[in-house]
Amino acid sequence: TNYPKQFVDLDDDFTLFQKTFNRIQSLSNKFIKIKEVLIVTNEKYRYLVLQQLEKLNNNLKFRLILEPISLNTAPSLTLASFAAVNSNLVVLPSDHYIKNDKILTSSIQKAVRHLDDHCIFLLGTKPKSNQSSYGYITYTGNETIKDVTGFVEKPDSNLAQELISNGNSLWNSGIFILKSKTWLNAISITNKLIYKSIEKSWKKKTTDGLFERPDRKSFSKSSSKSIDYAVIEKAISISLKIKLIELKTKWSDLGEYNSLDSIYRKNNKGNIIQGEVIEKDTFNTTV
């Protein structure tokens, strides 16, 4: 679409993208020093991103890395890792709802304190229903930091219910904490095509003011894989530890409009209303 949901103001406040950026600002404290924010987005959204950033009270340095074509999250994270070599990375999707930023900050701080060169941290949330559109992470242990034992991507409702009943699974929030060199080492082993293509595209990048543009030809040769498929689910085979921390606040991946039901209350007509609206013969609608 020309106007992705993360750039839409859903509640007369800030867009999901703006809320994510503000969330990053709240992360910066005596425990975590934010060096810079890497915004990896598609070339066609560059001015939209700048317009939304201009409306914020921003105190952080940011860089705009523009993907020439849309691939998936593994190439995006590989770009960010080449851009921030020898750094700790907090990977935050810009289209998620998170109710309590303080709880998120606390969870990320725990991960950063225990981070090393051979592990990746995930944040997971307690399943609220047998939702089949989310990924599930299975784990062992009752400690704050848990060991991941497996992944089930978008199970059917019966399997999802079984996972919930077992009591040892969380929804995958898509939030990762890791070292850039850990990712680059892992992706170079599990998917050489992504690593080589993105490495070459980054070396041949051009800079135009605020915009950093990876080379299109090299970038286009990369395969389109998610972070989970490219590395996380193959971690055991490359001696990479995957650790899990529960994010104990309300979270939602707003992938579809019906997912708004999880964060906004419906009125007696089944409508979700934001702003001043006159309802007439309107039912089961988001306005």
Task: Say what each PLM segment does.
Residues 9-91, 96-99, 142:
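Conserved N-terminal catalytic core of the sugar/cofactor nucleotidyltransferase
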Residues 7, 64, 120-122, 241-244:
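Conserved beta-strand scaffold positions in the cores of enzyme catalytic domains, especially
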Residues 1:
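N-terminal nucleotide-binding beta1-loop-alpha1 segment
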Residues 101-221, 239:
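Conserved core of the sugar-phosphate nucleotidyltransferase
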Residues 181-287:
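Left-handed beta-helix
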Residues 41, 92, 155, 178, ...:
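A conserved hydrophobic position in a structured secondary element of the catalytic/binding core
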Residues 89, 175-176, 224, 252:
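A residue-level structural signature of the nucleotidyltransferase/glycosyltransferase Rossmann-like core
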